[in-house]
Structures are given as structure tokens and as C-alpha cells.
């Protein structure tokens, strides 16, 4: 039971909204975390910090004169790196980084999202389970961390571990099972 506020207390609290805080960003973080099934809030904050650093770097590069060779070289390096990572869908201009480099763009490169896109799992939650249980490898490396970011080049090498029960079931379903591999 709370007492009724006095007049001067009401006046002081008139402009304070207890439901919406500035630091919550309108609950954008929980929405992104739920969409991409991010388990640690720190991962979201790391991605947010990375996006801010990239935007800040792009802004500082844009302040240099357009004919500066240093600016041209580093703009191209930054754009190539972001395209190779898969954060950018096309090789674009440095001015597009403000809108295109987002936390969602980085989250789309997470291993569970790539597995869902490649139809290796029905949902992102299932993909997270498969990764944590040790069923997935990228290239020759077994991956147990769902926060693993897959580059554009490594996307083709996402596959099941050789002795995985899921791989065995898939091969049996397709009638491609080789008894020598699973003996």
C-alpha cells in the first residue's frame, strides 16, 4: 500500500516516465535477442558496440578529403572486410554503412541463423541445440558455441559432424548410407 503523493512530489515526478527508460532503447535488444535466439545479453551489447565502432570509423573516414589516398584505401579495406564477413549484402559506398551495419546484420551471420537458412534445422532454437550438443562443424572444426560468426566463404562448409546421429539419420532417409563410414 502506497501513500498518495503530495503536491510538490507530483510536480517533481510529472516529467518522469517509469515505464520507458532511455537506456532500454524501447526494448529493441530483447526483440533482436528473441528473433535470433541470442542467449547472452552481453553478446547483443558486443554486437552493438561493434556496430558503433564501425559507424564511428566510417564517419571519421568521411571527414577526410575525398581525394586523399589514405581515405580511399581504408574505405575500400573496410567495405571489403564487411562484405567478406557477410554483414553487407553488396559492395556499397561508405555512406551506406550508417543504415546497413546493424546488430541484426551481424546476428544474421551467427551459425544457428545460417543453419536455419541452409535448412539444416527447422528453427533457430533447434539449430542452437544441435550446435551445443556438438553435431555441427564448420570446415574441419567442431563448433560448440552458437555465437560463432560464419563468414561468406565458410558458409559452404557448414555441415554435420561425421559421427553425428543426425547425419546418419539423414543419409538413411536419402538411401545414401555407407556402412563403412558408420561402423
Curated annotation (Swiss-Prot):
A Gene Ontology BP annotation from the UniProt entry: ribosomal small subunit biogenesis
MF (Gene Ontology): RNA folding chaperone; rRNA binding; snoRNA binding
Domain S4 RNA-binding intervals: 109-175
An example Gene Ontology CC term for this record: nucleolus
SUPFAM superfamilies assigned: Alpha-L RNA-binding motif
PROSITE patterns: S4
CDD domains with a match to the protein in the record: S4
Transmembrane segments: none
Subunit structure, as described in the record: Component of a heterotrimeric complex containing IMP3, IMP4 and MPP10. Interacts with MPP10. Component of the ribosomal small subunit (SSU) processome composed of at least 40 protein subunits and snoRNA U3.
Family per record: Belongs to the universal ribosomal protein uS4 family.
Protein name as catalogued: U3 small nucleolar ribonucleoprotein protein IMP3
Organism per entry: Saccharomyces cerevisiae (strain ATCC 204508 / S288c) (Baker's yeast)
The gene coding this protein: IMP3
Amino acid at each position: 500500500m502506497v501513500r498518495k503523493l503530495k503536491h510538490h512530489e507530483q510536480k517533481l515526478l510529472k516529467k518522469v516516465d517509469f515505464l520507458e527508460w532511455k537506456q532500454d532503447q524501447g526494448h529493441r535488444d530483447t526483440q533482436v535477442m528473441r528473433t535470433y535466439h541470442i542467449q547472452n545479453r552481453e553478446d547483443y551489447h558486443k554486437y552493438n558496440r561493434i556496430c558503433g565502432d564501425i559507424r564511428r570509423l566510417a564517419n571519421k573516414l568521411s571527414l577526410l578529403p575525398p581525394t586523399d589516398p589514405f581515405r580511399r584505401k581504408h574505405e575500400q579495406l573496410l567495405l571489403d572486410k564487411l562484405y567478406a564477413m557477410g554483414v553487407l549484402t553488396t559492395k556499397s559506398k561508405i555512406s551506406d554503412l550508417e543504415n546497413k551495419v546493424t546488430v541484426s546484420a551481424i546476428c544474421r551471420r551467427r551459425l544457428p541463423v545460417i543453419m536455419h537458412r541452409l535448412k539444416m534445422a527447422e528453427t533457430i532454437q533447434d539449430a542452437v541445440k544441435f550446435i551445443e550438443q556438438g553435431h555441427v562443424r564448420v570446415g574441419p572444426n567442431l563448433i560448440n558455441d552458437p555465437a560463432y560468426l560464419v563468414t561468406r566463404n565458410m558458409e559452404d562448409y557448414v555441415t554435420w559432424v561425421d559421427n553425428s546421429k543426425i547425419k546418419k539419420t539423414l543419409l538413411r532417409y536419402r538411401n545414401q548410407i555407407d556402412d563403412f563410414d558408420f561402423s
